[in-house]
């Protein structure tokens, strides 16, 4: 018993806490205020009980949960975080407790007031002594020498200035208090009530957890505990903290109620004492930065700006210094470092956007307070422009919609704050102007899901908020406003990515009239920057969406070059696994070759054309497979409104086998009968017919919960496989397909809703083929005999198409793409050219007029002998109408 007591006593005496070198006293001379910062690390197994802290002979002890009292009767605010807590013990009363070896390893005691005594010359160091109590024995004094730092003046910035100036706050309050009708049917008073309820819950919660309880954070938040596994716990933690900081501070800004500012302040002071704002146990892209630092920096910056008037001088100093040393400096340093991941946005696009936008917002907040802020801000601006330059000028985003919305919405906040405070408008960058179309074209017909290629979820459709709102309010993109109306994300609080509840009131204008893209936008669009093509029949709930991808390899990609998905009236008959399932080729709608999937590799789209009755895309996925000399080209012809022809040609220097796979959404039923497959779901049907000159077998299975059909084609060194997809809701919408395979071409006869037709896929470009009285030298050509005495011709990558009776339908001086409709009263032609071209179009007689879409007449030459109108057209997309 005595031995045990002696060991305990020895432990208490022999292992005092260690005071780390950054401990100091900061003298804020203009305020005549001193801030004592004591940073502890405890190495022993035993608790240390600190009853008093003595500075220059003056003792300070705990008065209550917020203040110390000196033996001179002065009251000083204090903070105890991390390894240090305050509790009452029977023998010691209310005391600081510095815990033993268990985590966290670090802790702080910070207090401020008039502390340093008058000196003839300012001291460089001061002795700080801790009075440690040990049972009934006399107290032990632990002396430490700490440096004294003198700050002559702390520049005071103008606050608030992030999103709202002081003069704009009354208008914000008025907007929230007054119910006004608007085209979006958004009620700001109702939304504010939801947000205030959230803030009220933040006032009283004692903890939150992340990743289904994998880690708990008790509030106010100490630095999270260390963890042995390489998992990004801090990403979830930082997002949750950002949500609380922004929500509490916004409610304070609007209501002026101090309790919200006090709660936000307590979080900020605790976070300010963390050793760093990026997880030390997660191996991220860089040693100093990850998603967490971006989230914490932005949340701390916005809260600092909005509750600024509730902070005393010491609190401003503590938070500002942390924002600089733990948020700005690590991101700024890593951005400028040679070979850093922040030198190249494509290494990790979403991570780059989060870190740089966090740096930008923090720098913007400190303008006027630190002379370095201009340099930091300019760096953030230059780097975010570099990021936008690397994203698609056409609006395409490489990592899929979950990360596209995450990165771009986060960036939009920084850009909007920059615009509001500095007048720098980066929303006119091509990426920011065009990404709304990437979103709009990707939305499922029923508006309840979105294209989920790469690491993306179907419900990412509800994650798009700020980018779309700011596109509408700043660039007058009424289609973006329509999308927000479709998803309804501004009619309620959706914490997508967990942190963005406050942005209903920032950059969103409910008075802009939405514009439905139906009938206004082309129904299909190419996003060449990422290798995506999206075909649609429109934006009604009864429409079809087909998406195809074959592009460069990148972050968060799947091994699925030449993949496709199809949504018919809300049903994903051809489905992607998204973020929840495998990234392997087997889980996607593409080919296995010799039973094996793809490896990472840059692939490309090699052809695209869209028109009113036929769309086309071609992708070369050869480089995705580790087989020397392999060629895999997939071509898709969309015969509107509901027939898709998918034509695969695989060549190799040796005999190979392939497996053609297509998955459907969970709950789909699949029936296979020979070469025909019927998929049913929610009273909708898709019929799949397949054909090949090689023999093949069929099977069914599932990748986790996604059922699939699989066709295994016998080995050959030149394999052709044709699949037709025909989604329907009625028997009369079913198409019929027959195909013939020849050495140089494939002939496909079909019937569809629009009539009967022919498609020819040629292996010999530039070689004239004649079938069923039409001839062409194109890669693909054909016709549809419409039910309304209308003939429709198409030529894809060719120079000449001769129609029935050998008359010229269309001739290009250089190869092009065209779709021609011939009726009694007019000939219309949709054309895509890669270079300037003289184009001759069939006209049975001299036209009354020739004009391009929009009504502008264009000059032409009419050849009565050839019955053609010739026009000269520049590269690009053209719609020509010949009035007869």
Regions found by a protein language model. Give the residues of each.
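Secretory targeting signatures
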Residues: 1-14
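CBM-like, beta-strand-rich accessory domains located in the C-terminal region of large
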Residues: 54-55, 61, 65-83, 89, ...
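Low-complexity, Ser/Thr/Pro/Gly-enriched N-terminal "stalk/linker" regions
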Residues: 140-228
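Extracellular carbohydrate-recognition regions
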Residues: 13-40
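Carbohydrate-active enzyme catalytic cores, enriched for enzymes
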Residues: 339-340, 366, 403-574, 714-721, ...
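Extracellular beta-strand ligand-recognition surfaces/modules
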Residues: 32-43, 53, 91-127, 131-134
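Aromatic-lined, polymer-binding surfaces characteristic
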Residues: 161-163, 169, 176, 183-189, ...
